[in-house]
Amino acid sequence: YADGVSPPQRALKELISGTIFAVSENQSRPVHTGCRFEVTETDITVVAVDGYRLALRRFHFEEAAGRVMTFVAPGAALKEVEKILGDTDEEARFTLGSKHLMFQIGEATLVCRLLEGEFLDWRRVLPTENPIKLTANVEQLNASIERVSLIVSERLKSPVRCVFSDNSADFKTVTTIGAAHDVCSVAGDGKNLEIGFNCRYLLDALKAVPAQEVTLELSNGLSPIVLTPTDGSDQFAYMVLPVRLKESM
């Protein structure tokens, strides 16, 4: 356990809570049931993927930490670590062994086995050249999608149909129990782009955004939507894959 990194507890907590919801529950690819940590001398990037979405959070050290490491930590262990971490600037240390990872948080020590396997090449998957960029208030957008998702359930899994036009986002969904429609104002022109989403994935991403406003990056109706910071920083990225829409909605 020679290689150690000591971010503030608050930062590590945000890295975990901002990604853990997107880990896969599918045991056929065990490596994706954990979060990938990429530690450089200047920052820590944490990524989770589950086949339908991607969550990324990044923390920049105030001064170079001097350690470089990449590993995948199990989601179950990270949930326990998240519970122990406080909202404080006190350090939380994690050190990498050959097959294990050790967290030291205050008086607590937690050791977990690393996940092995080929983690998704997320840099190749995350689209960066998205021609449509819209800015939205996170709370308003969240409320709009929540209202139309009231008639969606595990059993009635209808996608939400979104139409992004000039300064507005129009949400509709239809299930066997009814129809719902809501409009949210956004800044920018969506060029009448129509796209379908699993509303739970979009809501999970919005709830994890650590800001009051967010940029929605879009390309076309069959490409993912990416939520990024409005200030152009690389602090977070949330990608959700679209759902094909039936014409009748």
Predicted features, each with a name:
Residues 1-249:
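Structural preference for solvent-exposed beta-strand-turn elements
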